[in-house]
Amino acid sequence: MKDPIGRPVRIVSICFREGTKSLSEIATIVDREAARGCDLVILPETWLGTTPEPLDGPAVTTLRALAHQHHTYIVSPIYRLDGKRRLNSAILLERDGQIACIYDKGYPYWSEFDLSTTTSIGNDAPVYAADFGRVGMAICFDVNFPEVWERLAEQEAELVVWPSAYSAGSSLQAHAINHHYYIVTATGTKHCLAYDITGEKLLNERSSDLHISRLTLDLDRGIYHQNFNMEKRDRLLRERSKEVFQEKWLDDEQWFVLKAKRHGFSARALAKSYGMEELRDYLRRSRREIDRMRGGPFPRKTAARG
């Protein structure tokens, strides 16, 4: 990409029903799409079917070779065989084909415990520092459990990839609104959704058979609250008008979004140099300081009845 503005990441989401495409078919599609140029390819949840494979099995081995050949990241979610354990895993492959990060589904769906080998439960949601930004993963039923998404935000995720059997819709939008990271899906419903750091829907595409979506996101866009930022913002936009601009103003939420205008400049770095605090940091600091004044965190669980 020649002289990019901001921090763009080119994403390909490939959506199809679990077990309906062979490894050879998917390898051909990934090869073709990656050859067109992209930074990240995403496949849907357990795309191979219910038979688990080890990390040195044919699926991961084939996709590792394609990641290396095309110098692209790939997320391959499969049932992973780890010794005698089955895990529902999203495997992030680096541009050189190495395994960068593995997320094991923290909240498997109930039917996953009824398979011939029951599905083991993941314990954490890691975030990986890719060359384009910080990437986290969650899978399908995880969408219903806020702690997974909070954990990703705690680790400064900028993009969350969500492979799934279904679409989820506004449930995902809520997480984008609350945590201000991008969310991109690859689903078995042949439906791709993408949500902005503002929570706005960026993409909503589907097909009757296999569906492929392509989109580019700028991970350098920054979102801010009006509180304590307006004078600093005004000075930034006045003094650095050639490098950064206000892309969005969300009046009801009292938020605004800054974006770079020129190659070689970061909107978020410039805003920070002017003393501006990003929205996620502002809310985190507010929670920490108000909890300290209270004498402890606000209660999150209600005592069991009975």
Task: Annotate the PLM regions.
Residues 15, 78, 92-94, 104, ...:
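Short, structured patches in soluble enzyme cores that scaffold and shape functional sites
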Residues 1-32:
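N-terminal, active-site-proximal structural segment of metallo-dependent hydrolase catalytic domains
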Residues 20-102, 167, 178:
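Cys-nucleophile CN-hydrolase/nitrilase-fold catalytic domain and related Cys-dependent amidase chemistry
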Residues 82-155, 170, 174, 178:
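Active-site catalytic loop in hydrolytic enzyme cores
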Residues 55-75, 143-244:
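CN hydrolase (nitrilase-like) catalytic-core segments centered on the catalytic cysteine
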Residues 8-20, 134-142, 161:
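Active-site-proximal beta-strand elements of phosphoester/diester hydrolases
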Residues 127, 190-306:
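C-terminal beta-strand edge segments of enzyme domains
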Residues 19, 36-39, 143-146, 305-306:
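Eukaryotic scaffold repeat domains enriched in small/polar residues
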